[in-house]
Structures are given as C-alpha cells and as structure tokens.
Design a protein with these regions (language model features):
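Conserved cytochrome P450 K-helix E-x-x-R motif and the immediately C-terminal K′/meander segment
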Residues: 284-319
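Cytochrome P450 catalytic core segment centered on helix I
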Residues: 182, 191-241, 245
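A translation/RNA-centric and nucleic-acid-associated enzymatic feature enriched
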Residues: 306, 319-320, 325-339
C-alpha cells in the first residue's frame, strides 16, 4: 500500500511527454489533474455517467488505465483471479516499453515477491504466512496495548487545550503499533521510516526503497538471532520458509498499512465525530457511535480511495467494456462503494463495502486495522470528551493524490485535562513476567503455538520498541517527560509531517 503513495502526481513533470504513443488521442480523464484533487467524487460521478462501470483514465506520467467505478464490476474483477492477475509481468504497456520513464507508477508497481503482486500458489503461500503470523496477535492484548499507547500520546497535549490531531495522534498511534508488532528496535525503525519518507515524498524513491529494505533486513537478521513474540519472528519461523527478500516485501506491505492507510481511517472518522450531528450527543464517546463513524468512512470516503492494478490475462468483456489482455485496470474503492449506495441505500447498514478489497487479495489485516482505529478513537473521546474542531470544516485541507484520501490536519480545541500521574506498565495482559520474549515454536504444522483451553492463541504483544524510552531499572514503564521523549518522537513526527505535507 505504501508504494502507491504517489507524491509526485501533482507536479508538472507527471504529465505525459508530447507525442507519447501510448496516450495519443485516448480522451482519458487525467487523475493527476488539479480538478481531481479538489473534488475526486465529482470526477468519479462524471466518469460513471459518461462511461458506465469502467472508464479510461491516466495516472501520473500519462500511464493509461481503466478505472472501475461500478460496485458489481469491481466485485467480479476481484473475485476472478483466473482472469484478472495482480502480477505486473502481465502489464502489456510495461512489457512493450510504452510507459514514460518519469512515471512513478511503473517504478513501484513492478514485479516483486509481495503478496499483492503475485497470483496462484505463490500468492497462497505468502498470504498464508501473513495471515498465520498476524492471526497470532490476541485482540485483547492488542486492545490494551493500543489504549496505553493512546494514553501516552494524549498525555503530550491534553493539558494544552488545543492540538493538531493528525500529526500528534491519528498518524502516530498506528506507527507506534506497527513498530511494536514488528518487534522493531528504535534505531532500526527510525531508519526504516526515513527510507519510507524518501520513497513517499518522491525526493529519492529508489534510494528510499533501498534504505527501508536494508533496515528490514537488519531487523530480520536480529530476529533470526533473537526471536521473540512478534510478527517478524513469526514470519521467519513460518513453514512457508520465506526468503529474506520475501520477508522484506511482506513487512513493507504491513508497514504501509500503518504509516499510510490507518491515519486516514482514524482521522476521517474523528472528523465525522466532531462535525457531523449524526454522531454528536451525550454518548459521543460510546463504542457504537465510533463503530458507526468507521462504517460511514469505509463506505463513503475510504482512506485507500483507489487500489493497485489488475491485468486481464486474456481478452475479456466485463461491465459492457472490451478489455485486451494486459490492460491496466484500477479499482476505485471510493467510487464503487458510492455506486453501491446509489443502487441500494440500505447497504450502508452492513459491512459489504469494498474498503478492504474482496476476493483472494482482500486486506489480510482488516480486523486488526479496525480494532486499532476504534480503540484509538474511543480512548481519545473518553479522555477528552469536549473535543471541538478549531475552525470551519470547509477550511480543512485534504490529500490530493490518487490513492490515499484523508484530511492533512485536524486542529481541535478543548478544556485542558490534567494527565494522570501514574505510570503505565507495558507488559501485555495475560503474559507472565519472562514469557514475553519466548520465540514461536517452529514445529507446529501451521506455524502457531497451542494456547491453553479457553484462551486465544499467543495472547502476547511484544515489548514496546518505539515507546518513550524508560531509564534503566524502570521495568519498561513509560517516561512521558524529558529530553529523551523529544528525541524519540522527532524522527516519527518529522517523517509524518514530511509525507503529509508532500501530499
């Protein structure tokens, strides 16, 4: 997902070169144009009215694609892997050398051993490793960890009476959680985020990719020597026997969810809770309203607005359109969801949205993503119940790229709240002292350890690698004050500020 953050798409250099044979006379809608950034839903609506469920568009660099804006057509594409491949080796224009060298998309949507870019048995093997490894995280333990992470972040601004919640909360919660779940030491995570930042903001995409991959390889080497109860160790020990390159690619994909899509989900739901009267009232902090707000966002304004490309492996007809083998087809999750609501308004009462995809390539971490978002929102509204938007909702600025949707900043005001004086231990619930760093058992058939009867598998979350550092002998407790805290957060805040502004 991170690879799809095309921060160069709004620059003049993203336009196709004059006379490019791949784009002459296509009449395609340029999704890199300012109009799309200002109001993407107006563009989706116009495309649907003019072309039906599939419409010709151009990505950055003039890359041609068909954009799917119809719900039923999108479902059919995602559920027909025998016809629609995710492997860029099937991309005809790429294979024929027709794509601009300046384009961001072909450089990142390249053949690579990542679960979102492969099909068939290779896809099943990689996805099985991801699902088995992420499935070992106990939801109760994860909930407790997110609550404590949220408390620590809220402590940093709760006494000020005002805050900007995207950079200081909505984006930091998932980043800290991902570092925790990876079992990633601070120094490695700092370098990893610097690499991802260079990739995302377009300053050095290839160099940033290398830096991030090198940091992950160092993490993998560390976990081979010192396995622990974390996703990295579980992926390494999985019976699928992933290569180091495959391990790097799967971790990059998971990291993309935390640094990219999750801030948009949390931020957009919080915007609704603060500005939409349907979500106001005395029970504002209640879990039902939070869940309703998340459903609203996932249906009407999903954080991943458009997803990566599909390629028909043979000529085919779908949605009233003839596609040639190797055509690039991009599914607009935002447009297809709204198409479904136009046809059947009652759908919004269920979770049949496509915000997490569908079919064999549906997001494997959707349940954890939703849990992190809901807990982060509940905790914030519980700690600061009188949050109010500082300014008019019409003044909020939005990301203007093709793939990711969300507000750039979310300024709020509130009555100052005194932060609790007690420290919070980071030992996960249900884990006895000394058990936290036990490695996974490599001999289990499906890569999982047996859990006691009545308990969830592996109810452990690794120690907080990216927490605010604690002094020696503190027992892993938070230290929310002092110079170390400022140093700890500087890299994360710098990274997040950098990529948000680049959008």
């Amino acid at each position: 997902v991170t690879q799809l953050y095309d921060s160069s798409a709004q620059r003049p250099g993203a336009l196709p070169p004059p006379g490019c044979p791949a784009h002459a006379g296509t009449g395609a809608e340029p999704l890199h144009a300012p109009e799309f950034g200002r109001d993407p839903f107006a563009v989706y609506r116009r495309l649907r009215e003019a072309h039906g469920p599939l419409a010709p568009v151009e990505l950055d660099g003039g890359v041609p694609a068909m954009l799917c804006v119809g719900y039923e057509t999108a479902l059919e594409i995602m559920r027909r892997p025998e016809t629609f491949s995710k492997d860029p080796r099937n991309w005809r224009d790429r294979n024929e050398g027709l794509l601009s060298e300046s384009s961001f998309a072909p450089r990142v949507l390249r053949p690579r051993p990542q679960v979102d870019f492969v099909d068939g048995e290779e896809h099943r093997r990689l996805r099985g490793a991801i699902e088995d490894s992420t499935g070992r995280i106990d939801p109760g333990a994860l909930r407790t960890y997110v609550e404590r992470t949220a408390d620590t972040l809220i402590d940093q601004f709760c006494e000020a009476g005002e805050a900007e919640l995207i950079g200081s909360y909505c984006a930091l919660v998932p980043v800290l959680v991902m570092g925790q779940l990876f079992g990633c030491p601070q120094e490695i995570m700092d370098r990893l985020l610097r690499g991802v930042a260079a990739f995302i903001d377009g300053s050095d995409p290839l160099g940033g990719d290398r830096v991030a991959a090198e940091a992950l390889r160092e993490l993998i080497d560390l976990k081979r020597r010192e396995p622990a109860a974390d996703i990295t160790s579980w992926l390494i020990a999985h019976p699928a026997r992933l290569t180091d390159e495959e391990l790097v690619e799967q971790l990059l994909l998971l990291l993309g969810m935390g640094t990219g899509v999750m801030p948009g989900l949390i931020g957009s739901a919080l915007r609704l809770l603060l500005t939409d009267e349907r979500f106001s009232g005395d029970v504002m902090g209640g879990s039902m309203l939070v869940e309703d707000a998340l459903d609203e966002v996932l249906w009407t304004d999903p954080p991943l607005a458009n997803m990566g490309l599909y390629f028909p492996v043979h000529d085919t007809n779908i949605g009233g359109t003839r596609l040639r083998a190797g055509d690039a087809v991009m599914i607009s999750l935002a447009a297809t969801n709204r198409d479904a609501l136009l046809r059947s308004p009652h759908k919004q009462g269920n979770r049949a949205h496509l915000a997490f995809g569908a079919g064999p390539h549906a997001c494997p971490g959707r349940s954890s993503a939703r849990l992190i978002a809901s807990v982060a929102l509940e905790k914030l509204l519980d700690r600061i119940p009188d949050l109010a938007l500082a300014g008019e909702v019409e003044q909020l600025k939005w990301l203007s790229g093709v793939f990711v949707r969300g507000v750039i900043t979310l300024p709020v005001r509130f009555a100052p709240v005194i932060k609790p004086g007690s420290r919070r231990t980071m030992v996960p619930p249900g884990v006895r002292p000394g058990e936290r760093d036990q490695p996974p058992h490599p001999d289990q058939r499906d890569g999982r350890q047996d859990a006691p009867q009545g308990a969830s598998p592996l109810p452990s979350v690794p120690s907080l690698s990216l927490s605010l550092p604690a002094p020696p002998g503190s027992g892993g407790e938070f230290q929310p004050e002092g110079e170390d805290r400022q140093k700890q957060q500087s890299a994360l805040l710098g990274f997040l500020t950098r990529w948000r502004r680049s959008r």
